[in-house]
Regions:
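Structural marker of alpha-solenoid helical repeat scaffolds
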Residues: 66, 112, 146, 179-180, ...
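N-terminal leader/linker segments that initiate helical-solenoid repeat arrays
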Residues: 18-100, 104, 335
Length: 337
């Protein structure tokens, strides 16, 4: 479930990933002096603490190339790349490219420590964020195999299994996580998503309500609740939940896309397009937002505004084929999807 991934993508990269009790001895890097290694890692950590990810990546890339067999070097390279990818002013395509490089770095680190549960879990989350779902599943499975007592690892593996359509195994893992973490909203939110995938939106609404009761101020769960209500045939309730939020929150992609979907469910396609247009205007460097707006305006029958949004996307770096696809949108496609 993307909601939970969004909460933890940075947190997991900060987990201690040194050798655990079940880890094999890491491959040595005989060409790199210990003092040089420690100095490089201190420099990278210092740059990250000072919010200078570009400088951190520069040092980390050199370290990783000089010590390809050292897990610490590969892991901190991945961590620096994640920090760079999460910079708010980075264009969306650049962010995707950097996150893909981070996933590669975490793959290399995880291969050097196959039984390091924390590292495998972190590699899974980064792979998921980079939209490399098969790799993510493999890492989640490795983390859970290394530490089957961890409810967190069961939760993430369960979410991955749900996404792959393995409903029975997903339910087993998610219910185990729920029993182990009764005060956490995350397993309940994941079970709500599983119910929705299984075609039972009413059961999903019940479960997401339980999750929200444990975290009533969570914006992510509020959006998930709105989605469940819309899918259960109550788009008015979905809008009531989301339009009450502050405008900057409503303009964020997850929220604006759900608002647009609710408007479409009500037959208000121009309102849907306007919602996505406002979101795009709030982040002019994000061409994906602009293309969503262009597609929505096409579906609303406003080719002029669609072209304006498409031009904005092109200026932000959108690939030409993506722009053409947005301008070919038909009423069969839902704005914000």
């Amino acid at each position: 479930m993307r909601v939970i991934l969004a909460w933890t993508v940075l947190a997991v990269t900060m987990l201690p990933t040194g050798c655990g009790r079940t880890d094999p001895k890491p491959v040595a890097a005989p060409t790199l002096e210990p003092k040089k290694l420690d100095a490089a890692i201190r420099a990278i950590d210092s740059y990250l603490a000072a919010d200078k990810p570009s400088e951190a990546v520069f040092v980390a890339e050199k370290l990783a190339s000089e010590a390809p067999g050292l897990m610490r070097a590969q892991e901190i390279h991945g961590r620096a790349l994640v920090a760079l990818a999460m910079q708010p002013d980075l264009p969306s395509q650049d962010r995707a490219d950097v996150m893909a490089r981070a996933a590669d770095a975490y793959d290399r680190a995880a291969a050097l420590a196959p039984t390091n549960a924390a590292l495998q879990h972190a590699a899974g989350v980064i792979s998921d964020t980079a939209m490399r779902h098969p790799q993510a599943v493999a890492h989640y499975e490795a983390a859970f195999a290394a530490d089957p007592s961890s409810a967190q690892y069961a939760l993430y593996l369960g979410m991955a299994k749900a996404r792959d359509g393995e409903a029975i195994e997903a339910r087993r893992l998610l219910e185990a996580a729920e029993r182990a973490m009764p005060e956490s909203p995350d397993p309940k939110a994941a079970l709500a998503d599983l119910e929705l995938r299984g075609g039972d939106p009413q059961a999903a609404r019940i479960k997401i309500a339980q999750a929200r009761a444990l975290a009533p101020t969570s914006i992510e769960l509020r959006i998930a609740d709105a989605r469940m209500r819309r899918m259960a045939g109550a788009p008015h309730e979905s809008l009531e939940l989301l339009l009450a939020l502050d405008p900057p929150v409503r303009r964020e992609p997850a929220c604006s896309q759900e608002i647009a979907a609710a408007y479409v469910a009500l037959g208000q396609v121009r309102e849907a397009a306007g919602t996505l247009d406002d979101s795009a205007a709030a982040a002019p460097n994000d061409w994906k937002r602009a293309l969503r707006a262009a597609s929505a305006w096409m579906q609303a029958g406003d080719q002029v505004r669609a072209m304006i949004s498409a031009d904005a996307a092109g200026l932000a770096g959108a690939p030409a084929d993506e722009v053409r696809a947005a301008l070919s949108a038909t009423s069969d496609r839902r704005p914000g999807g």
